[in-house]
Curated annotation (Swiss-Prot):
InterPro entries: KH_dom-like_a/b, RbfA, RbfA_dom_sf, Ribosome-bd_factorA_CS
Lineage: Bacteria, Pseudomonadati, Pseudomonadota, Gammaproteobacteria, Legionellales
One GO MF term attached to the UniProt entry: ribosomal small subunit binding
This protein's UniProt keywords: Cytoplasm, Ribosome biogenesis
Gene transcribed to yield this protein: rbfA
GO terms under cellular component: cytosol
One GO term (biological process): maturation of SSU-rRNA
Family: Belongs to the RbfA family.
Name of the protein: Ribosome-binding factor A
Compartments, as annotated in UniProt: Cytoplasm
Oligomeric form and interacting partners: Monomer. Binds 30S ribosomal subunits, but not 50S ribosomal subunits or 70S ribosomes.
Amino acid sequence: MSQRQQRVADLIHQQLAELLKKEVRDSRLSKISLTAVSISPDLKQAKVFYSLLENQNEKEVQKALNKATGYLRHLLAQATVLRYVPKLEFVYDESIERAHRISFLIERALKKDDSDESS
């Protein structure tokens, strides 16, 4: 990713996080965290990765984000000085969930090892 792409991605990440916190009134979107933004080389499309902070229905949150995409893009255009605001695509980030699952499995295996050694 070029420096310009990274700067634009960082700007979009920062502004969208702020807009979701202050401007969007949909309660399904109040408990999400933006984890990363990836932008195309031509700066026309941005993938916004998010994770859920609480046990929420991922499909419902995705539906709410898809519905709010146009509104968020409009707010982003007002909040930034970008010549062209990229199309936004929201993608659920499973990496955090996967990391928790791996940690759990490792802990369980270590506990099993400890109990086997003490028997």
